[in-house]
Amino acid sequence: MRTNGRGPRDLRNVVLEPGVSKHAEGSCLARFGDTHVLCTASVDEKVPPHVYGTGAGWVTAEYGMLPRSTHERMAREAARGKQGGRTLEIQRLIGRALRAAVDLRALGTRTVTLDCDVIQADGGTRTAAITGGYVALALALRGLQQRKTLSRNPLARSVAAVSVGLVEGEVCVDLDYGEDSTAEVDMNVVATGDGALVEVQGTAEGKPFPRSDLDRMVDAALEAIGRLKERQEQALRG
């Protein structure tokens, strides 16, 4: 039993609350235990230069943490004048993950931007952003279809993400901050709802780990992502 009372394969209490923003075309407040991320989707009727002329659309993401989302106040990146390397890495991950959910040609020559803002952080902010960002994206695309802007929904598949790691030799999913900081191995797994991998990020802390542990962690993550898919479907029905 983990210190927070969960079993090794148990997710934290996951709540995906859709439609929380009055102005955004799609929105979702993703709560994974004490990690809370506000995800909004905005539609722009143009594409970035590298996509212009292809007839396809684009999905991208921005990520940020509120100053007091952590134990001690962080300076806003805007006040420092530039985004940090961690921020850039995470928002690129979110964008890659959510593009895997979309037929970009069916989207047409428009861009959907996901803004993922961490209100409170207790581990797994990037995976919460992807899981909640998918709901916000799906709502935005549904709205375009309902307004007849799109003839068909370009959403091709669901995408979700979860952290997984080795904690005292045990494979555990959805790590909180305390577990993440002491894990022997820490991974983030992004996958479609039918179990196809989109991205796997994994790091050994201290000593290498065998392939068998990698397989066990990926299997546990995919099982958890299957349950997250159900939460996403519930949110989109709500």
From Swiss-Prot:
Cited SUPFAM superfamilies: Ribonuclease PH domain 2-like (SSF55666), Ribosomal protein S5 domain 2-like (SSF54211)
Domain of life (superkingdom): Bacteria
Keyword Transmembrane helix attributed: no
CDD domains for this protein: RNase_PH_bact (cd11362)
Single GO biological process annotation from the record: tRNA processing
GO molecular function: 3'-5'-RNA exonuclease activity; tRNA binding; tRNA nucleotidyltransferase activity
Gene3D superfamilies: GHMP Kinase, N-terminal domain
Family, as annotated: Belongs to the RNase PH family.
Quaternary structure and interacting proteins, as annotated: Homohexameric ring arranged as a trimer of dimers.
Function text: Phosphorolytic 3'-5' exoribonuclease that plays an important role in tRNA 3'-end maturation. Removes nucleotide residues following the 3'-CCA terminus of tRNAs; can also add nucleotides to the ends of RNA molecules by using nucleoside diphosphates as substrates, but this may not be physiologically important. Probably plays a role in initiation of 16S rRNA degradation (leading to ribosome degradation) during starvation.
Protein name: Ribonuclease PH
Organism expressing this protein natively: Anaeromyxobacter sp. (strain Fw109-5)
Name of the encoding gene: rph
